[in-house]
Amino acid sequence: MNFVFLWAALGGAIGSSLRYFVGKMMPSKFLMFESFPLGTFSVNIIGCFVIGFMGHLAVKKVFGDDFGIFFITGVLGGFTTFSSYGLDTLKLLQKSQYIEAISYVLGTNILGFIGVAIGWFLAKNFVGVN
């Protein structure tokens, strides 16, 4: 029997549970914003960093396909969430919180990309997997 789907499902359960936990731990007030989806923002930035790091290791075949499916597809797929990002942005716009919405979109995209790049760089240069 092929356990690929079970690995992805198990990882997804772990990742989504972690996302829920992080979301509950984060305050809704952030910097000068009264309402900011800090939980979703945080998991997406953390997830970008981790996927950059693990993505490099996957390309270099440091771990097997099953672990990649479990961790990258499952855990990180469940942990990060583009759909919640879109919903959080829409809610900010509906409440006329335009500065928060713009800050959230720009911050998520810019810091997300930087997180991926830093994760990749660290995996490549400090783990010794070239």
Swiss-Prot record:
Pfam families: CRCB. GO terms for biological process: cellular detoxification of fluoride. It is a multi-pass membrane protein. Na(+) binds at G77, T80. The chain crosses the membrane at residues 3-23, 39-59, 67-87, 102-122. Na(+) is not transported, but it plays an essential structural role and its presence is essential for fluoride channel function. The keyword Cell membrane applies. PANTHER family: FLUORIDE EXPORT PROTEIN 1-RELATED, FLUORIDE-SPECIFIC ION CHANNEL FLUC. Fluoride-specific ion channel. Important for reducing fluoride concentration in the cell, thus reducing its toxicity. This is Fluoride-specific ion channel FluC.
